[in-house]
């Protein structure tokens, strides 16, 4: 489901200016003049074409904030994780990617810009294994040439062969960025055994036995490696909504993207202050989030 192509036309046909109009009315209780201004910011900011070359690959298609921001946040969560927990950059780190839709392909692109190499991509119809690692240009080409939300390349091998090989490649980073509930315990075991250090959830509830929150596989992964939960890693679009609901929000690419990056960094900083160990990130983050919600609920 695409926000710009699918959701907004439906809500507009129902007389709403923006899908977040209920939040503006109910949560913020905005006055009429302020409400119109905030809804205008939401309409403009989400659909804004990204022009700053730092945030978009140059190509024939115009890309909006809504197309790029979630994948950007996923990549930034990994970059901030390495900086905060290990004092390292992404230079020379390796990654495998599950999916090649907006989130997965954008995350892969931003990871390469930060210095990482993509050594494997697995998509529904096949995948690519490149143990030397793909940098900015090859990944940009794959990003620009995807067919809808699907990987499209003459270098693709079958799904079966990719699935057999990719989990044991020894990538530092894994981005589950396809549908929910796909990642299995044997896949997690193979990644742990081959040295994977961090999983950043581009997909919501990516593990096969997840329910509303973490199932057994997610809990296990959280004890064995660094698992950045979906509500931090892929909060990009939700955070853009919150940013655009501020009065007089600056509607530049830099301001919007930087706000998402800093929000993710702050969340990981809070987790690290509470629990400095690089395991248990998801459990700790959920505990902190629930505490904040309880405070709000109780009126503190």
Annotate each PLM feature.
Residues 1-3, 62, 66-70, 99, ...:
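Catalytic cores of large soluble enzymes that bind and process phosphate-bearing ligands
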Residues 1-90:
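Glycine/serine-rich phosphate-binding loop and adjoining beta1-alpha1 elements at the start
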Residues 2-12, 107-110, 123, 130-136, ...:
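Short acidic, glycine/serine/threonine-rich loops at helix termini
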Residues 8, 13-23, 94, 119-120, ...:
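Structural motif
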Residues 54-168:
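Glycine-rich phosphate/diphosphate-binding loop of Rossmann-like nucleotide-binding domains
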Residues 103-107, 182-186, 208-210, 234-237:
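Short glycine/serine/threonine-rich phosphate/pyrophosphate-binding segments
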Residues 126-227:
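Rossmann-like adenosine-cofactor binding region
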Residues 192-300:
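Adenosine-phosphate binding glycine-rich loop
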């Amino acid at each position: 489901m695409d926000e710009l192509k699918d959701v907004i036309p439906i809500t507009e046909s129902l007389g709403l200016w923006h899908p977040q109009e209920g939040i503006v009315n109910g949560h913020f209780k905005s006055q009429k003049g302020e409400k119109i201004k905030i809804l205008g910011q939401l309409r403009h900011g989400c659909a804004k074409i990204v022009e700053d070359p730092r945030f978009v690959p140059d190509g024939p298609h115009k890309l909006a904030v809504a197309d790029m921001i979630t994948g950007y946040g996923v990549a930034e969560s990994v970059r901030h994780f390495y900086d905060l927990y290990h004092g390292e950059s992404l230079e020379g780190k390796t990654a495998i990617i599950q999916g090649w839709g907006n989130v997965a392909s954008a995350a892969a692109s931003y990871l390469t810009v930060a210095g990482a190499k993509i050594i494997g991509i697995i998509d529904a119809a096949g995948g690519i294994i490149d143990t030397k690692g793909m940098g900015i240009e090859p990944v940009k080409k794959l990003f620009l040439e995807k067919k809808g939300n699907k990987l499209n390349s003459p270098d693709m091998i079958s799904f079966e062969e990719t699935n057999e090989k990719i989990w044991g490649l020894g990538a530092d980073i894994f981005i589950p960025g396809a549908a929910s509930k796909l990642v299995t315990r044997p896949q997690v075991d193979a990644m742990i055994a081959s040295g994977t250090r961090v999983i950043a959830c581009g997909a919501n509830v990516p593990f096969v036995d997840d329910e509303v929150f973490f199932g057994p596989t997610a809990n296990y992964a959280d004890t064995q490696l660094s698992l950045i939960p979906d509500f931090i890693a892929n909060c990009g679009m939700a955070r853009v909504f919150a940013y655009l609901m501020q009065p007089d929000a600056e509607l530049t690419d830099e301001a919007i993207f930087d706000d998402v990056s800093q929000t993710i960094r702050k969340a990981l900083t809070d987790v690290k202050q509470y629990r400095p160990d690089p395991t248990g990130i998801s459990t700790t983050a959920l505990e902190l989030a629930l505490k904040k919600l309880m405070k709000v609920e109780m009126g503190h």
